[in-house]
A protein has these predicted regions:
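Phosphate/NTP-binding elements of NTP-utilizing enzymes
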Residues: 1-246
Length: 246
């Protein structure tokens, strides 16, 4: 949120770590799998959707799949935190805010449940939840699987199998959750997957005042930050900051 405004619609002005991630994803999009390991609330979902949307707009016959652990997280009428709603917002905005200017929009589009078509250039978005038959109907330039580590046990491997032959490029996006499951396997099994790390320590506001500890001994990483007198450091060996300690 921008300082001095209460609006929920703000410009997506990217930070340097987001710029780097955009370029890395775009470099290999459509070629091989991408694994995104992210901290919470760093815009990762908006990032891959925006990248897909750019290709949907400007690259002919670009077909994309988007998946989450339930159908309602992908598309549900009236629900504004679904993946498809975010794509609707990128195109048309909401309540007069956001969206593309009229001159930039495709002349012909089509929208139905779990589907969004650019009929000017033949590009499509198709949504799906975790079923064994997801995206069996045709090849995709890329398929994004959002919050993959949060998929129910079993569904995560079904999604992996269902998407294996549907695209050369699956984008596995998640905050890590334990040392088991399909997301963990994908990120830790040797392969040609392009791994992209989005860590809260790179955020210019949240990464202020970084510190850590070794065997209970404090180590200040951000030498320029002045901690308040009497600050209660947490000496658990993790990289921390006042943001993290809240």
């Amino acid at each position: 949120r921008l300082v001095g405004t209460t609006s929920n619609v703000i410009p997506f002005r990217t930070y340097k770590f987001q710029d780097r991630a955009f370029l890395e994803m775009d470099e290999v999009l459509g070629q091989h799998d991408i694994g995104v390991e992210k901290s919470r609330d760093l815009g990762a979902t908006w990032m891959f959707l925006t990248l897909f949307f750019h290709h949907w707009m400007f690259h002919d016959f670009s077909s994309f799949g988007i998946m989450s652990r339930t159908a309602d997280l992908v598309d549900k009428p009236g629900k504004k935190d679904t993946l498809m709603w975010k794509l609707d917002f990128l195109l048309n905005g909401d309540g007069g805010r956001g969206g593309l200017p009229a001159w930039m929009k495709p002349a012909k589009t089509y929208r139905s449940m779990m589907l969004m078509e650019n009929r000017d250039n033949g590009s499509t978005f198709e949504g799906a939840s975790t079923t064994e038959d997801a995206f069996r109907g045709g090849r995709k330039k890329a398929i994004a699987i959002d919050e993959y580590a949060a998929f129910p046990t079993g569904d995560d491997y079904k999604a992996l199998a269902a998407t294996q032959h549907a695209t050369d490029c699956r984008v596995f996006v998640s905050t890590p959750k334990g040392a088991s499951g399909a997301y963990y396997d994908v990120m830790h099994t040797p392969s040609n997957i392009r791994k992209i790390i989005l860590n809260w320590t790179e955020h210019p506001d949240r990464g202020v005042g970084l510190y850590t500890s070794k065997e209970g001994v404090l180590e200040i990483l951000d030498k320029e930050y002045k901690f308040p007198e009497g600050y209660k450091f947490v000496l658990d060996g993790k990289v921390r900051a006042p943001y993290y300690d809240q």
